[in-house]
Curated annotation (Swiss-Prot):
Segments traversing the membrane: none
Catalysis: reaction(s): Endonucleolytic cleavage to 5'-phosphomonoester
Biological processes annotated in GO: DNA replication, removal of RNA primer; mismatch repair
GO molecular function annotation: manganese ion binding; RNA binding; RNA-DNA hybrid ribonuclease activity
Domain named RNase H type-2: residues: 18-207
Cofactor binding comment, as recorded: Manganese or magnesium. Binds 1 divalent metal ion per monomer in the absence of substrate. May bind a second metal ion after substrate binding.
Names of the cofactor(s): Mn(2+); Mg(2+)
Stated name of the protein: Ribonuclease HII
GO CC terms, sorted: cytoplasm; ribonuclease H2 complex
Highest taxon of the lineage: Bacteria
NCBIfam families, per the entry: PRK00015.1-3
Keyword field contains Nuclease: yes
Key words, A-Z: Cytoplasm, Endonuclease, Hydrolase, Manganese, Metal-binding, Nuclease
Origin species: Paracoccus denitrificans (strain Pd 1222)
Length: 210
């Protein structure tokens, strides 16, 4: 298995950057819930061992690493709501969540390493897009772990308010069971109306009431 490393952060620090943040988001694909981003500035002297892309970790390992990151590092989380996703589109909402996470850091980064191939439009700091960053860069890997864990917790809470959709297990992603629940139970306030499977159901409901 290839592991992320600290080389991008080290290069920036050698070039004079004082603080380098890694940023990642989770929740672009779900039919329900917010999109969540995290920003992390690692302390080079005490980087938690075992950081990796959150998708490659078990839930137990993810939680243990998240606790270490939150205890040792400067970190923050940002969200964009379902309403913002529907109004802006999912890409812009993801970037909004990233900017909110960066703004929540105690220290202002000199450089932001962003997972993906595009920097947020409203980023007011120097940034570098890193394709596959959660598997390449330790700061981004740490951010991916926090974003995943904290969004999953939100979806567990929402599942208690709206049982039957399986959000505690599927985190709002379009599993067959979630799609069937949409047909059987209908659309909740936490479903993304701009996403095709939800939009189609709403259109059918509107047609049926005419």
């Amino acid at each position: 298995m290839n592991w992320p490393d600290y080389s991008l952060e080290e290069a920036a620090l050698r070039s004079g950057a004082r603080f380098v943040a890694g940023v990642d988001e989770v929740g672009r694909g779900p039919l329900a819930g917010p999109v969540t981003a995290a920003a992390v500035i690692l302390d080079a002297g005490c980087i938690p061992e075992g950081l990796n892309d959150s998708k490659k970790l078990t839930a137990k390992r993810r939680e243990a690493l998240a606790e270490l990151v939150m205890a040792r590092c400067d970190w923050a989380v940002g969200h964009a709501s379902v309403e913002e996703i529907d109004r802006l589109n999912i890409l812009r909402a993801s970037h909004l969540a990233m900017c909110r996470a960066i703004a929540g850091l105690r220290q202002r980064p000199c450089l932001v390493l962003v997972d993906g191939n595009m920097l947020p439009r409203d980023l007011d700091l120097p940034g570098q897009a890193v394709v596959g960053g959660d598997a390449r860069c330790l700061s981004i890997a740490a951010a991916s772990i926090l974003a995943k864990l904290l969004r999953d917790r939100i979806m567990v809470d929402l599942a208690q308010q709206h049982p039957g959709y399986g959000w505690e297990a599927n985190a709002g992603y379009p599993t067959p069971a979630h799609r069937q629940a949409l047909l059987d139970l209908g659309v909740t306030p936490y479903h993304r109306r701009s996403f095709a499977p939800v939009h189609k159901i709403l259109c059918k409901e509107e047609t049926a009431t005419r």
